[in-house]
Every structure is written in C-alpha cells, then in structure tokens.
Regions:
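A late-sequence structural motif
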Residues: 72, 214-242
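Alpha-helical linker/hinge and terminal dimerization helices associated
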Residues: 9-10, 31-53
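Residues within the DNA-recognition helix of helix-turn-helix
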Residues: 1-5, 76
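A ligand-binding cleft/hinge motif common to bilobed small-molecule-binding domains
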Residues: 114-121, 185-214
Length: 242
C-alpha cells in the first residue's frame, strides 16, 4: 500500500513484479536517491532540534560587568564553553547601565550586573551574589575618622555602584567630594596609588596584583547586589536557560 501511494504521488511507475517479487524499475533510481537524501536531512533536522531543545547549540549573547567576567564567574564561563562546544557564547563587558540598555533593545539575551535602585519595566531579575565594597586611601592617609575621608575617585554619575557608595559614605558621616571618575575599577585603583584620592572598590579588584591596596577599615562601606537579568517578555530559550 505504501509503495502504491509513493508511485501515485510521484506519477512514475517505480516497481515491477517478477513472480512473487517486486523490483525497482531503472527510472526509480533517482527517486530512491532523493528519498535517501530526504531521510538523511530529516535526521539532521531532528538532531538540530534536539540540540536546540537541550541548549547544546545556538547563540547566547551574555553581558556582564568587569568584576563578574574577570573575577567571580570567569571559570564558570570557561567551563561552560568547554562543556557545550556547539554553543556560540558572545560576551560583552560593560557598566550596568549600558548592559540594561542593550538588554531592553534586544542586543543581549542575559546580563549579570549591579542591581538597580528600583525595578525596570520589562526586566526580570534574580539574585546572583553580594559583593562588599571597601574604602581605600593613598599611602599615609590611613587612620583618619570618616569625617576626614576623601577626596574621592569613583564611578561616573548614573552608575549603580556609585549610588551604593554614596549611600554608604553618607551613613558613616563621610563627605563625598569627587575629583575624578572612571568606569574601570583598575583605573580607580591606580589613581589611589598615585595619591589622587580615596576610592571605594570591591576587594577582588582593589587588592589584586603585585601592589594591593590596604583597606581603611575592616568593615565594608556598602554592599552591592549583583543580579542576573533578562527580558520578561521573551520566549524561553534552552541555551540561555543553561
């Protein structure tokens, strides 16, 4: 019945009977070759669909702040790339504000950044980790009470981290007179070493390298909360979820 249906659909006699046996006609060779290609391509499609369903392939556009990409999740990112070689993981490192902007316009699928002070419409966030921020001073300036701290080198206006720092210093009664700005913690660290000002930084970046900065006090000035964020209105993607 199946062979008869195939002949009917193709419109060309494909088989002939020889006694009890059915044989392919010569003109059926091309049809058979085509059928084999279709079966192979169908299997390829099934394998592709399986990798998409399980997250073993596809494109993931991940955005993170520098501390996440360099210090906290660098090994996890490398391990995931090795474990899922079919995944095209594209990493963007930028400040939190720029990452949220890129997420909202669809340029990124997932971001790991500093939690904003309030909710952002259309964005779903979940906790990632908490990061303590400590005060650091140039050589010879340690030992002062908070009222005499500064001046400061810090993140630019609009930075989520700067908002955390400003609130923490205000709670301590420390002035927040800013003399220089940079989005890069490593640059701020070098400014402190050069004596340009004080800074509040994550320990992972301030105390790294051959010449680590020394904390002004053991307790942190503040804590910034890092979150994993994605657009709330997008269809679930196994590669992103992984």
């Amino acid at each position: 019945q199946g062979l008869a249906e195939l002949e009917r659909r193709v419109g060309v006699p494909l088989f002939e009977r020889h006694g009890r046996h059915t044989r392919l006609r010569p003109q059926a060779t091309e049809v058979l070759a085509h059928a084999r290609r279709v079966v192979a391509e169908t299997r390829d499609l099934a394998r592709w669909a399986e990798t998409r369903r399980t997250g073993a392939a596809g494109v993931v556009r991940l955005g993170t702040i520098d501390a996440v990409a360099v210090h906290y999740r660098a090994e996890a990112i490398r391990r995931h790339r090795r474990a899922v070689p079919g995944l095209d993981l594209r990493l963007t490192v930028a400040p939190s504000g720029a990452l949220f902007d890129a997420l909202l316009v669809g340029d990124l699928d997932l971001v790991v950044c500093v939690e904003p002070t309030g909710p952002i419409a259309g964005v779903a966030m979940s906790p990632c980790l908490d990061e303590s921020l400590y005060a650091y001073a140039p050589d010879g300036a340690h030992g002062r009470p908070p009222e005499e701290w500064g001046p400061w080198v810090t993140y630019p206006r609009g930075s989520h981290t700067r908002e955390v720092i400003a609130a923490g210093l205000a709670a301590l009664g420390a002035p927040f007179a800013v003399v220089a700005e940079s989005n890069q913690p490593e640059v701020l660290r070098e400014m402190v070493r050069l004596g340009m000002g004080w800074a509040v930084l994550p320990a992972a970046q301030a105390e790294a390298g051959a010449e680590p900065l020394a904390r002004v006090r053991r307790r942190p000035v503040g804590v910034r909360h890092l979150v994993v964020a994605r657009r709330a209105d997008v269809v679930s993607d196994a590669a992103v979820d992984a």
